[in-house]
Amino acid sequence: MQKLLIILILFCILKFNVDVEGRTAFPCNQSKCQERCKKEIKKGKCILQFISVSASQSCRCY
């Protein structure tokens, strides 16, 4: 039971606090993504990101 609780907590942390290398776990808006990445002199693209068993759109700067 404790292992299940730890896995659930880690899943929630990864799902809601992802902000690594230009990726966020919030729904992606293509124009806002491009604008945000333009500040870093990079191109922005909305990608489908899979976290465990769920999927979400996120912004990726490259």
From Swiss-Prot:
Disulfide bonds join 28-46, 33-59, 37-61. One of its GO terms (molecular function) is toxin activity. Residues 1-22 form the signal peptide. Its main location: secreted. It is found in: Secreted. The record marks 62 as: Aromatic residue of the functional dyad. The record marks 45 as: Basic residue of the functional dyad. The keyword Nucleus does not apply. The keyword Secreted applies. One of its GO terms (cellular component) is extracellular region. Keywords: Disulfide bond, Ion channel impairing toxin, Neurotoxin, Potassium channel impairing toxin, Secreted, Signal, Toxin. Expressed by the venom gland. It comes from the Eukaryota. May block potassium channels. Has the structural arrangement of an alpha-helix connected to antiparallel beta-sheets by disulfide bonds (CS-alpha/beta). Belongs to the short scorpion toxin superfamily. Potassium channel inhibitor family. Alpha-KTx 23 subfamily. This is U10-hottentoxin-Hj2a. It comes from Hottentotta judaicus (Black scorpion).
